[in-house]
Amino acid sequence: MGYHTILSGQRFTFDSVKEVMAKAGEHKSGDVLAGVAAASDIERIAAKDVLAGMTLRELYENPAAPYEEDEVTRINIDGLNRKIFGEIAGWTVSDLREWLLSYEADNETIHRISRGLTAEMVASVCKLMTNLDLIYAAQKIRVTAHCNTTVGERDIMGTRLQPNHTTDNVEGITASLFEGLSYGCGDVLIGLNPVNDTVSSLAEVLKRFDEVKHQFDIPTQICVLGHITTQIEAVKQGAPCDMIFQSIAGSEKGNRAFGFSAETVDEAQELMRTQGTAAGPNVLYFETGQGSELSSNAHWGADQVTMEARCYAFARKYHPFMVNTVVGFIGPEYLYDSKQVIRAGLEDHFMAKLSGIPMGCDCCYTNHMMADQNDIENLSLLLGAAGVNYILGVPTSDDIMLNYQTNAYHDIGTIREILGKHPIPAFERWLEKMGIMENGRLTKYAGDPTIFMKKGR
């Protein structure tokens, strides 16, 4: 079945729902690389016009990957609330957009409707929204989860403290950890990307994180972001761990390229419920990012926004504690410049929240992108206004191990003050006890990691 519209006397024809969706998206270098992007601005507007009139039922009937061949599609479809979908199946994508932006749509009503939405519906409405629409709609939605503490409450903007080190030296990691804590970072997670994906290396870092957490009575979560199978083995061997992590894709083929399947995640979740160190019930952490499916030829000819939305359909089955897009990490082949990175960050956050995901963002870029730190600060502030659950922090914005740039430890204090945000309440009380915060602001001791050495190590 073809689709067509006429704009400025020119007829535009699209062969499939997938083509309409791809060409309706904002310009992304990754979609150009995949050969699915609109050839011109007017073709993009024509595709948006067609998509706006498409019903949610049509999108349900046309998933990006076939149900019979892809477990992400099966999770996406099988997890749908049929009663709620039946109430809105006749809506057009334009109807959904207008409703989301109306006063009728609030946190409770959006959460209910979201149970009747597939990833393709979520991606489609995203494509009809401006950046301001994405911010306005997302800030209506609060998605909370509990591990040791609760993430996602209103007026809370958390951080993952990322003390990466080029050799996984635990003393170097600990020094960076203390610096991050001294700036008020780490309420959502103390989480390291390891250089060495071995059970022994992960266990050594986890033990140090656990020691620091208990020595200073820090209300937070710990995780070392090795491969899911390595983490599983480390926990089985007794390593203390609050959450298990895995990068995920929007297709089964993409996940298998990452070296896992839904069955692996099922095993990890059950293991954490029986041998993990957290209270739970939310004990998983996922990362995503537009373009990963194309990089493994696992995108099924779909655009990167649609495949990203499918990541959230996969994730919501597992009720994770935290999910974040690593928005600019994959490079300019997929997001060319700051305009595309900012747009993608806002898209990912909105789509995840609409999918019921406790969403954060690694506001980052690589050195060969047409972006700089000012752009990342802009994105961080926009996401803060949109109600993002958390961002990441590293020393002076420069991750010396991953060789990319993200937010600095000291950024979060500025953003919280500007927007009237706070750390997770239990963590803020701990910061006050340590003398790092007072009356909602950082004190003169902020940024001084030696306060931890004086108090214990």
Q: Where in the sequence are the language-model features?
A:
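Anaerobic metallocofactor- and corrinoid-dependent redox/one-carbon enzyme cores
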Residues: 1-174, 189-457
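Catalytic domains of carbohydrate-active enzymes, especially glycoside hydrolases
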Residues: 176-189
